[in-house]
Amino acid sequence: GGIGMCGALAACSGKDSAEDEGTGPLRGTVTMWSSFTQGPRADWMKKMAEEFHAKNPDVTVKIEQFSWSEFNTKWTTGLTSGQVPDISTALPNNVVEMINSEALVPLDKVIDSIGRDRFPKPALAEGQSDGKSYSVPIYSHAQVMWYRKDVLSSKGLSVPKTWEELAKAAKAIGKSDSLYGLSVPLGTGDMLGARYLNFYVRSAGQRLLKDDGTANLTSEAALGGIKYWTDLYKSVSPEGSLDYAVLDQATLFYQGKTAFDFNSGFHISGVATNRSDLVDSIAAAPLPRMKASDPVNYPAEVSNVPLVVWEASKVKREAKAFLEFLFTKDKYIEFLHSVPGGMLPVLNDIAKDPSYTNNETIKKYSDSIKVIQDQVGVGTAIGMEKGPLVQAGVLTSQGLIEKMYHSIIIDKTDVEAAAKDCEKKLNEAFKAAGASIK
């Protein structure tokens, strides 16, 4: 990709490779775009920039902060104008688009230096293309089932292992303004309808994509999932959840208004902040499965949040050195402890390291965190089960699955007809996004 970006300046491709292998002191200004904008994470990143500068006096790391949505606009417009950073945080779906735009440099040497076998293979695969790695995941979180221990015990219910048991338990709890069995979030401005359907389809050993890259919404498992969530929406969910986005949904659990919910370890701090009286009443369990005898920890949804280095950078060697510096053991653990239980180590040895586990929150919720960590080892982003695909971004960014639910619930469209229509729309959107469909 390098030569194409340089046009007539053929010599610059030689400079790139020499720079990658370069020796001598690191020097220059490294601009980093970071979407770690909240308090402790943001403070940590600034501190790392200062510490790296102290170690490498000729290098200054400049941190610029952008929310994830601002970042998305900024890098896509920046690519045309040449206004891109040297290093940045990213999301797996961004990385797919960046690789396709030839905007990134391979980071295999950095990964090997940190220790390739320390990373889960699926996490690295999300940033791989033609055998090269273009992203380095820095933390992970995974979707699991959260529940209220106090509510289950007051109703004499055990923790559901299957989808059928979950539906029965949620219906036994019922719905009232103070407590809902669970909420089924279907807002068209978010991806939760796709997320919940994906759980169900993954538990049946399928994906939301067929092997040829087209959408899978009309298989028996997919139709079963659509009917399942439609039924639970009608029977136990707040009516308004038809328009819920991520925060609306999470807030209900934070406030103690849902008995079951699906989310990551970020739920721990959310409940602690909103309902400190409930901190001993929440726990996580593996996602429900089809049959109780099915494997407990099937691959479902994991978010691996990566860092990338940009092709247009003139300080690639310095940017890579800073990236690697962030994985220094004690510094990396400090980062994870800034949101304990929410940001999980992507390095499997750190997950077991006493200096990581010896944290009040991590000790208190160790059983729940183990459930999440187990899923981190096997799951992927929705639609990326076979590596980086453009389809993954379409599945989660265009609200098509959510609109299908609206059509079933509001317009009373037949489930099979709505699923077939949505499948067709998804396939058209995949092609429009440049997906190569076999």
What residues fall within each predicted segment?
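C-terminal lobe and pocket-closing loops
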Residues: 266-278, 291-399, 437
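Glycine-centered hinge/linker elements that transmit conformational signals in sensory
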Residues: 170-172, 214-242, 287
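Extracytoplasmic/periplasmic solute-binding protein
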Residues: 130, 134-138, 143, 165-215, ...
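Conserved C-terminal helix/tail region of periplasmic/extracytoplasmic solute-binding proteins
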Residues: 153, 376-438
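Short, solvent-exposed loop/beta-turn-alpha elements that line the ligand-binding surface or hinge
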Residues: 26, 105-121, 186-189, 204-224, ...
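A structural signal for short loop-to-beta-strand junctions that line the ligand-binding cleft
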Residues: 85-86, 115-152, 180-181, 294-299, ...
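Hinge/lid segment of periplasmic solute-binding proteins
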Residues: 92-143, 158, 192-196, 283-285, ...
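Conserved N-terminal structural module of periplasmic/extracytoplasmic solute-binding proteins
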Residues: 1-97, 112-116, 159, 242, ...
